[in-house]
């Protein structure tokens, strides 16, 4: 994933959605995409909008980026907003996502999704899994 460019990463996320039974999945990401890189329907029929960010693991997703996705959710009248990234969320961004029902798929959860966990199952761990203090320290020493 770290070697993909932005378009390849969006295609990768769209393919994972299709694998999990999502329908009407299309990659729409481009400049001026109104914050939607992938759109479609979950297996239960709810509409979704996905923002994909392929960042260096040293960079964190900001609160503003999550708020932008919330605006996209309203703009596209999507029932579910999903933020998928190759990095992690800042504390305020993670809290904003959880408080507003955004499914926050960070680097660790993306690995689980890629290894076969279904997208709907990731909602159960939303806001978790960025690790305990020791894990965060190890990650910080590795990537920063």
Which residues are covered by each model-predicted region?
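Mixed-charge (Asp/Glu-Lys/Arg
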Residues: 1-34, 39-144
């Amino acid at each position: 994933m770290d070697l993909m460019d932005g378009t390849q990463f969006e295609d990768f996320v769209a393919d994972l959605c299709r694998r999990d039974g999502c329908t009407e999945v299309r990659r729409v990401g481009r400049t001026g995409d109104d914050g939607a890189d992938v759109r479609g329907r979950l297996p239960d029929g709810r509409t979704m909008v996905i923002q994909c960010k392929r960042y260096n693991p040293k960079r964190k997703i900001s609160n503003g980026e999550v708020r932008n996705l919330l605006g996209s959710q309203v703009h596209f009248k999507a029932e579910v907003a999903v933020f998928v990234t190759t990095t992690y969320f800042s504390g305020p961004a993670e809290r904003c996502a959880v408080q507003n029902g955004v499914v926050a798929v960070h680097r660790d959860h993306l690995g689980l999704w890629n290894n076969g966990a279904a997208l709907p199952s990731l909602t159960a761990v939303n806001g978790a899994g960025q690790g305990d203090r020791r894990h965060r320290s190890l990650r910080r020493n590795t990537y920063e």
